């Protein structure tokens, strides 16, 4: 079947893993405590704090305790949705203030533009929140790449290593799974996507291969047919 849509991971695929771990996460860890204290009374933030309380089983946790839980989750690299949402809010402020610029590999930015010009629909699936995804591409070093994408998916669609998540995403995109190409640097994610019927392509930026999947080192090497 002809590929009509591309679903891409971010971390290690379109963007350097180091950007997330060496820039974004430390920025959020530094600024999140004060952000939560300043905005805890706002409905959007309060809802996420309640979600942290529910997830941690500490229904009566005060703001400082919730902050401690969030910082612990960051240290553990937990993929908790309320943490991702709050991080996204902190990053949004950083992008607005000009303190952050999203990293996107030049080869990825060029390929995404070319694919869009060819009429392919582009989507993102990342463990980072949808808001954070939009910020990375919308405020990137390569300019505003946001208009290239038709949709974004995060952990609200399910874990990235479960095939049901990819079936759900294919349904949301509205195409047969076999017409969607998924790009990732993680074998378990590629396996899950393949199990759901998607086409898969591994991206190994440092070279090598991703077991059981065709693999490239750069978006410049990707041929979409």
Swiss-Prot record:
Positions in coiled-coil regions: none
Keywords, comma-separated and alphabetical: Amino-acid biosynthesis, Hydrolase, Magnesium, Metal-binding, Methionine biosynthesis
Cofactor note: Binds 1 Mg(2+) ion per subunit.
Subunit and interaction comment: Monomer.
Catalytic activity: 5-methylsulfanyl-2,3-dioxopentyl phosphate + H2O = 1,2-dihydroxy-5-(methylsulfanyl)pent-1-en-3-one + phosphate
The EC number(s) this enzyme carries: 3.1.3.77
Function: Bifunctional enzyme that catalyzes the enolization of 2,3-diketo-5-methylthiopentyl-1-phosphate (DK-MTP-1-P) into the intermediate 2-hydroxy-3-keto-5-methylthiopentenyl-1-phosphate (HK-MTPenyl-1-P), which is then dephosphorylated to form the acireductone 1,2-dihydroxy-3-keto-5-methylthiopentene (DHK-MTPene).
Record pathway: Amino-acid biosynthesis; L-methionine biosynthesis via salvage pathway; L-methionine from S-methyl-5-thio-alpha-D-ribose 1-phosphate: step 3/6; Amino-acid biosynthesis; L-methionine biosynthesis via salvage pathway; L-methionine from S-methyl-5-thio-alpha-D-ribose 1-phosphate: step 4/6
Protein name: Enolase-phosphatase E1
CDD domains: HAD_EP (cd01629)
């Amino acid at each position: 079947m002809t590929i009509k849509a591309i679903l891409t991971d971010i971390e290690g695929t379109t963007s350097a893993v180091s950007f997330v771990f060496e820039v974004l996460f430390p920025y959020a860890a530094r600024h999140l405590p004060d952000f939560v204290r300043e905005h805890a009374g706002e409905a959007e933030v309060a809802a996420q704090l309640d979600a942290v309380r529910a997830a941690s089983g500490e229904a009566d946790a005060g703001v400082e305790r919730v902050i401690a839980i969030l910082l612990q989750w960051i240290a553990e690299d937990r993929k908790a949705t309320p943490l991702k949402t709050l991080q996204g809010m902190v990053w949004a402020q950083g992008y607005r203030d000009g303190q952050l610029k999203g990293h996107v590999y030049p080869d990825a930015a060029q390929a995404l533009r070319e694919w869009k010009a060819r009429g392919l629909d582009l989507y993102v699936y990342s463990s980072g929140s949808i808001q954070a995804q939009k910020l990375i591409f919308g405020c990137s070093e390569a300019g505003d790449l946001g208009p290239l994408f038709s949709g974004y998916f995060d952990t609200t669609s399910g874990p990235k290593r479960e095939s049901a998540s990819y079936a759900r995403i294919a349904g949301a995109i509205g195409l047969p799974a076999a017409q969607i190409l998924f790009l990732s640097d993680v074998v378990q994610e590629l396996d899950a996507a393949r199990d759901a019927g998607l086409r898969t392509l591994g991206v190994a930026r440092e070279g090598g291969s991703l077991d059981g999947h065709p693999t490239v080192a750069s978006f410049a090497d990707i041929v979409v047919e």
